[in-house]
Amino acid sequence: MDLCKKSINDPLNWEMAADSLRGSHLDEVKKMVDEFRKPIVKLGGETLSVAQVASIANVDDKSNGVKVELSESARAGVKASSDWVMDSMSKGTDSYGVTAGFGATSHRRTKNGGALQKELIRFLNAGVFGNGIESFHTLPHSATRAAMLVRINTLLQGYSGIRFEILEAITKLINSNITPCLPLRGTITASGDLVPLSYIAGLLTGRPNSKAVGPNGEKLNAEEAFCVAGISGGFFELQPKEGLALVNGTAVGSAMASIVLFESNIFAVMSEVLSAIFTEVMNGKPEFTDYLTHKLKHHPGQIEAAAIMEHILDGSSYVKVAQKLHEMDPLQKPKQDRYALRTSPQWLGPQIEVIRAATKMIEREINSVNDNPLIDVSRNKALHGGNFQGTPIGVSMDNTRLALASIGKLMFAQFSELVNDYYNNGLPSNLTAGRNPSLDYGFKGAEIAMASYCSELQFLANPVTNHVQSAEQHNQDVNSLGLISARKTAKAVDILKIMSSTYLVALCQAIDLRHLEENLKSVVKNTVSQVAKRTLTMGANGELHPARFSEKELLRVVDREYLFAYADDPCSSNYPLMQKLRQVLVDQAMKNGESEKNVNSSIFQKIGAFEDELIAVLPKEVESVRAVFESGNPLIRNRITECRSYPLYRLVREELGTELLTGEKVRSPGEEIDKVFTAICNGQIIDPLLECLKSWNGAPLPIC
């Protein structure tokens, strides 16, 4: 590759960085998903993506696995740099890590380059594992596989002085699903991830303390690992510079960051769709997504978030119903929704921009050459620099973690509104669906748990990179803490998965409650109408009675009153329905004037008959419709099936087999949430999520 020609028009790489952000975030996520699912990752040194790294990391979750192929065209460049090191040493050239010692002790000199590499690996094997091959002190095997991939990609570029055969051996380990055991802790990601990477080198050189895990989870020593992987020729005797090439890089931190960012991008889209579903079940006003509002703010993340929500809500059956509700008694209702709904695009937009920028930063890092010294064969020199400094990892992971915490905070705020009957526009308190609210507390426990999750997530949002300690005799006096930050971000992702699972189950509960509400309100309205006709239309002598004019107002009461405010005992005098129905008749009687003095035309005289018949009929009708609803054959179809958000509901209810939770059943909220959590961890959420947006054209609705 001719670096001079490549950079002549963009020497500072700003144009390349800007070009990488062209197009929508959603299109980028779709591309990431496609790359994640490809069966082969082809490495050439410059085109590795975050999704491909995540794919290799998650190979255990795939039946056939993903294979790695090395570009044969890279062989010559790799060999040239390796040959240069050997030639340089034979000429007596003094080079760091080849003839000179390491770090603060680089003033030491040796002519035994191979022994120096061997000692490098030995003294860096300073990690602690505890007991077992997958203990709390062992790096997750997924991250180790990803790190191996990233390190190969770096070394393929031919600036590191290592033999191609070593890269082929690491590739065989990956393709055979053999994973070296690396310590979880012990790196400051400058000079690279020295300690964990030394254990990969230890396996390649056959160190007796090396351990690996085989395809079926079995524990392997170095010899067994080579045998299973089909690596012939015995362990590697490292040549000068090769040990340094293996350990002096940012592969572990950037690999973990890649895994984290693949999932973070999915969660960014999910948060947009869940906010739209929240709007649907809350009977929210969709005007908060109007393009002009967001165009005037200029931020692309916000504009896209609003456009995605607008797309979900456009034509939504819930929005049409909500519009009618808002037109009823408009002066008695809030003019606008609360912030968790109304400002969700403004809240999520910056988080999406942060996650997207972090993704690009890490993609540049995993395609970078980040060891020291760098071998420039074309100019016949070794360059001593600091590309091993993993600051892009530490900074991008701190930023990503803060973005994830903000997404979680919004979810918690929306969840809190959803379960609160003061705010949720007629849904029952705690989203209880049972007949007796005194014995059904719905999602109360889940809300407490959500507060716990959110608190932990907010704590994790604190930065790691401001806790740098001077290391290695003050040679590494500033260091990135990249892997530490990536590990904390991985924890944040896990918590956000739990929060998303809990929230999605609650949203599906709310969807079903709206469905139940519609079925029950229909029968209440019909029953009130029928009872009114039977008891209020005719007088004692068959004449038309003035009370008949009350029916319209009685039905308006049914429309206005929240169904779940009286559903458990619809004819209770303590509940608003009966009180307000009576008030309608009293008001009509007061207007009846002198006619009230005549027993045959008195509306007051009709109140008792109306109430008695309603008490005799309405509870039975409500219970009958509820029983039909619970049997799975409701009279009115669920509106969600007509909405673009339906694929997520279908996943939770039909594919995962969750159900409407009530205090009358044994099943707990946690059991249902666990099903969704497992599905999210397995990636089952991705296709339904993208299906919700399959018809979006990538632009907001035009301003008309």
From Swiss-Prot:
Catalytic activity: L-phenylalanine = (E)-cinnamate + NH4(+)
Gene Ontology biological process terms in this record: cinnamic acid biosynthetic process; L-phenylalanine catabolic process
One Gene Ontology term, aspect cellular component: cytoplasm
Enzyme class: lyase
SUPFAM superfamilies, per the entry: L-aspartase-like
Subcellular location: Cytoplasm
One MF annotation (Gene Ontology) recorded for this entry: phenylalanine ammonia-lyase activity
Entry keywords, A to Z: Cytoplasm, Lyase, Phenylalanine catabolism, Phenylpropanoid metabolism
Protein name as catalogued: Phenylalanine ammonia-lyase
5-imidazolinone (Ala-Gly) crosslink site(s): 190-192
Residue numbers carrying 2,3-didehydroalanine (Ser): 191
Source species: Solanum lycopersicum
Protein EC: 4.3.1.24
Cystine bridges: none
Listed Pfam families: Lyase_aromatic
PTM field: Contains an active site 4-methylidene-imidazol-5-one (MIO), which is formed autocatalytically by cyclization and dehydration of residues Ala-Ser-Gly.
Higher taxonomy: Eukaryota, Viridiplantae, Streptophyta, Embryophyta, Tracheophyta
